């Protein structure tokens, strides 16, 4: 991958990722970025988490690592399936747009559990496609619900809707606890413009609604078509 263009992979998720990271405690120790590439996420990670200490990046692409090191990251060549780090040496870890490229995701997630100290957290973001209910009216309705629930927006984003269930299970099986996951439809207005719109599990949406709004929501869901859509999945574990 051209390292000059790889930042575009992360751009659609930037606002959601910032919200998720902002709701997590500051890491008590170095922050690990597995699959760091050229370090395009460094500024976001430092500003959102106020990471004044070590930011450790691991990648197998040495050219990209050179660019990451110039950006202030401690860049290490390594394999996500066998991290070249001591047990419990990191305060937290992120794995962004990387998990889907690994041939043994369970092993990689167990390695992340090994190197993150007890009490630390993990954030995973990956891409997939899935058949799911969707409509323009349902999209706009969900956006309005999120705007109404500004203070609890992260709670609504990570409700583990069905497309995110397998990712949540995968992370739990690797030894992580308190796992929460969300799914986000990637909408492309044109070649240069993308945005992500959250899918909210029906149970979680129903718990937020008055009887009148619940009837409106049920009608929208019943009217929605099943489509094969590109999704971004995001999950956290402790």
What is each residue range found by the language model?
Residues 81-93:
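A short acidic, Gly/Pro-enriched loop at the edge of an enzyme's catalytic core
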Residues 123-187:
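Conserved catalytic/acceptor-binding region of the Class I
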